[in-house]
Amino acid sequence: MRLTLLGLTVAAVLLSQVPAAWAEEPPLEPGFVSIFNGKDMDGWDGNPDFWSVKDGVIRGETTAEKPTKGNTFCVWRGGTLKDFILRIKFRLQNGNSGIQYRSKEMDKWRVGGYQAEVENAPGKVGFLYHEGGRGWLVNVGDFMVIDEKGEKKVVGKVWDKDDLVKRGYYNNKDWNEYIIIARGNFIQHYLNGYPTMSLIDNDRVTDPKDPADRKGAAMEGILALQIHAGPPMVVEFKDICLKTLEGPFGKAVRLFNGENLDGWVPASDALKETFGVKDGVITDTGKPAGYLRTADDFTSYVLSLQLKHVTGGNSGVLVRCVGPDKVWPKSIECQGQTNAMGDIWNIDKFPMKVAEDRTNDRHTRKMHPPNERAMGEWNDYDILLNGGDLQIRVNNLLQNTATECEVVPGKIALQAEGSQKEFRNIVLVPIGAEAAAKPEPAK
């Protein structure tokens, strides 16, 4: 028994070093479509000298006898990508590769545009490159904003790069999974469950119909896989699944500037010392109970943020918060309690429809077991409100949904509820009619 307990303890420690959602293969949420059949190149178009299907995977290969004179690409012919989530696995034996999206075909099998980097180089794999355009864009670990003049500024971190390398976020010469999310001008990369970069691209939008116009942001384009010119190489891809997202999505807004609480209001004077800013994050002591809310109202949007449990206990993110400020305002609470992220609490009878089999009174449990990261690590919280529909994702796993939510402008609030939390990288991407009217681009 003692040996068994020791083994379980060691296993638990090891599992705590990886994102909980990835200890096992996470389920694919509804709406994903496989775009590679695992049998042949149907729907894909690349130079047959280099691209083929072998053992159920797309294989790109160059040899000393058969090199490529320049970068060459295998293009998905199923249409163009605008707003989407892409999940794709890759294995690189040697050389350099990439996954192109919102890209342009400049010539036959020659592509330019956003590229998720693929190379056997921890600390580099996961960054964002602009092939045939603006070049290197966002380093691993960075949250970048590009302004209207094309000037780049790192405004925060999605994860510490050195810590990613230490954790082994990349599996050298083995299978890895990218998740690439593009909504409006907000782009995110995840590798094996870890966030590797975020970008708000406020650069001028290029003409999607002009292959030569590549020095700017791209809102749509093709998907392709790269073989890089150079020494002989082998790269493989499989399990390619795409989910098209309903928009339109507007310009992303940073609700928290990383420096002060401009744009935020404590619910009462008693909370003035509860919330603060330190090292680019919003700190929350948890006491007294209450919340910090936005000064502005929002209706339909994606809210993307990172939340850290400094101590175990309760908190939450309130959306469509309406009425007078009080400890429990009428709203939808996206739970922030330790091991309960993804749960829904209905506060003050907010009109909405939830899954009856997971609901007890005002509380709707999440769909899957907890998938939060270890205490003291950042969790990615993604809350979508589009009209009456609500979706809550924790570390890229869809954990809860609701329908027929009352469509009303409301505040967004961060709760103080007895435990210490931190919040950062709070980004709002407006949806639908609100997308055309939403405010200043992110600074």
Predicted feature locations:
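Carbohydrate-interacting regions of secretory-pathway proteins
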Residues: 22-443
